[in-house]
């Protein structure tokens, strides 16, 4: 299963929904980067993604986007193959 990394904050309902969706797909370990506690990592997120909102989710080396992007990818049938990649 591909490695999953999520930029998040302590109070973020979309982060919780993203984590719930990923866990329903069998993802046991999500690397969470708390950008509210680590300003340099927030800058890193903004530079890498061009976005300022959380969550920002990476599956393997692929930037999926936020929760709406993740859910849309799942509905389109693209999330399972992405997660299955080594």
Report residues per predicted region.
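Local sequence-structure signature of Cys/Sec-based thiol-disulfide redox active-site neighborhoods
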Residues: 1-29
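Short alpha-helical
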Residues: 13, 40, 65
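Thiol-based oxidoreductase modules, predominantly thioredoxin-like and allied folds used
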Residues: 29-42
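Chalcogenol-based redox active-site neighborhoods
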Residues: 25, 47, 80
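Thiol/disulfide oxidoreductase modules built on the thioredoxin-like
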Residues: 47-53
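Alpha-helix termination/capping residues and helix-transition junctions
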Residues: 24-27, 51, 64
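Non-catalytic, surface beta->alpha helical segment in thiol-disulfide oxidoreductase systems
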Residues: 59-85
């Amino acid at each position: 299963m591909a490695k999953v990394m999520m930029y998040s904050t302590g109070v973020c309902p979309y982060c919780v929904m993203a984590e719930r969706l990923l866990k329903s797909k069998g993802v046991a370990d999500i690397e969470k980067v708390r950008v509210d506690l680590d300003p340099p990592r927030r800058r890193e997120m903004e530079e890498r993604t061009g976005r300022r909102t959380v969550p920002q989710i990476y599956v393997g080396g692929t930037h999926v986007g936020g929760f709406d992007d993740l859910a849309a990818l799942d509905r389109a049938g693209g999330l399972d193959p992405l997660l299955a990649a080594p």
